[in-house]
Amino acid sequence: MDPNIWGPKFWFSLHSVSFTYPFSPDAKDQERYKTFFEILEHLLPCVLCRKNYSKNIQKYPIDGHLDSRKSLAYWVMDIHNMVNMENGKPTMTREEMLESFERQYGRKIYLDDPSPHITKKKLDDIAWQTENGKLALFLSLIHI
């Protein structure tokens, strides 16, 4: 199967998976995601892609990158850039990649947990912005 057809969509999906990884994953989360990313070397729909992915994850293993969302997201970005370099395609900085995904999703993507930065004053300000304070608070929290 031609990776020029399925590859960009597949990378988009892998990045999206990393952006929804827990901020503070437990051991079970870490094991599930590790299994997911490692099993890909056997499932990619292109023999050469499978070989190259296997080589890349041996060179740059996922171990040590499962302690946080940011760490996993950066690992996926770095693996993606390694593949792009091998294929003579342009690479992007981590910041450029994140901005690209934020534009595509139309919202901020948090790699660090934003909740410690939510103050009581911010919550009060949000609640006063509408007659239905609870709805405003709920909507603001799900879009953080």
Model-predicted regions and their roles:
Residues 20-41:
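Glycine-rich loop/turn
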Residues 11-18, 37-40, 53:
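Short alpha-helical scaffolding segments that buttress acidic/His motifs in well-ordered protein cores
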Residues 34-43, 57-63:
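Amphipathic alpha-helical segments that form the core helices of the histone-fold
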Residues 46-49:
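Short, thiol/selenol-centered motifs that function as redox-active sites or metal-ligating centers
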Residues 121-129, 135-139:
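Long, His/Glu/Asp-enriched segments that create or flank divalent metal/ion-associated functional microenvironments
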Residues 66-116:
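Domain-level detector for trafficking modules
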Residues 1-25:
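Short terminal alpha-helical segments
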Residues 142-144:
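Conserved small/polar residues in nucleotide/adenosyl-binding loops
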